[in-house]
Amino acid sequence: MRFFKYENGRVSRPSSRFLLTLTVSIFAYFHTFTIAHSAPRHLFTETPAQKSERLSWWTHDRFGMFIHFGLYAIPARGEWIKMTEPVSDEKYDEYFRLFNPNLFDARDWARRAKAAGMKYAVLTTKHHDGFCLWDSRFTDYKVTNTPFGRDIVREFVEAFRAEGLHVGFYYSLLDWHHPDFTIDMCHPGRPKMAKKWEFYGTSDKDFPTLNRNRDMARYRQYMKDQIRELLTNYGKVDILWMDFTYPEPNGKTHLDWDSEGLLRLVRSLQPQVIVNNRMGLYDTADGWDFVTPEQFKVCEWPTVRGERVHWEACQTFSGKWGYHRDAMTWKSDAELIELLVHSVSKGGNLIMNVGPNARGEFDDRAKRKLEAYARWTRLNGESVYGCTQAPERFRAPDGTLLTYAPKTHRLFIHLLCYPGKDLVVDFGDEISFARFLHDGSEIKFSQIESCPENKLYRHGGEGLWQLSLPPLQPDVVNPVVEIILKNKNTLMHQWQ
């Protein structure tokens, strides 16, 4: 994957290869999350300290599971299939009549998420196709009207809470099934154009004709009714993941959703819920809690108006969110672990997606990837949980990432490319002890004056340290070196 600069909600210099693989949601997100440079409006009275406390569990836990599940698991070609191919309404209705994930076991999902080291989970209660995974009284287009007949959302929250995980709801602002949702550039009913992914160039005069019998006011009320259901009938909801706003051109803005009214409703029902940034309230200071770079790695801690913000990278195992039977682009174990470490090393979270198949199970490939996370987090979890970006005075050697635990004053060196020899670090005079995290074995270190190979030079004998690593990489993916820093107020680390 490539690196990009993320500043004020914009991503600079994406590669051509990256642009070719963007989904519509990413495309719209990158082009619409522009931040006004004027003083932001405040919708609520929460102080920064209160917000920090509200998000404290989330910024500590760092790692979550995204679950994209719905009718699109049957065609097994991704969650945007109705838009991208496109699939006719008649064909998609057939998936509704056939939907019966009879091997679904929310307890199995929850156990696998917990074993993988994930601390929270977010389920697609409704994706863009409009199909609802709960027994909503405001639509017939719901899971309880399929052959399956069970409330998946209820089983999800009960199972994940039982395993001690926080639970969240993804809710699509788009709805391709609702008769009042107006047709726009991201709607399967848009005028057909020459190219499959060509949205621009459609004449504005086409849309009033297409939408003459549609009423967004009625759809807005439908959304609010459903959000009220989700935030009233399922107990405490920890995260609300709304998706998405795309104003240009012939799209939808925050006014189409009445995002302010929607967020006020959310806060009135669940004051402690954490909400992402995709409702389009970019000119506010508190219309969102965290930003959501999708399927790319940031090169530095994201900022808005020059200030660092809470953020969460959302990533997939293979490039698709919904189940994709024939995907050939599955990431390696090392790549997946690096995504987690990379997010934490830049002060953020990672939510990694699983797309269950049409039987309701995680397929074997997904299970193997979750097991890879499980092996790594069991041994190295303390290098991500409660960790953040290292202080600037610590420079990451080439081929490594650094994470830092403020409470224990520990620095962690993640060896993405094993050096196969001594590792030179520029950590000043702060190293007290060094060891591999996976087995606790000591790593000897000594002070040196220079390292021409890494273009590191110090005169006076301070700053450079040589860690004596074994010549062969330990039998673990992405080994981690724990550095206990000198701090008279920090007790020696106690192994659990």
Spans of features found by a protein language model:
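Short, aromatic- and cysteine-enriched interfacial helices/patches
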Residues: 3-4
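Short, low-complexity intrinsically disordered segments enriched in A/P/G/S/L with frequent Arg
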Residues: 13-15
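Bacterial N-terminal signal peptides
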Residues: 19-32
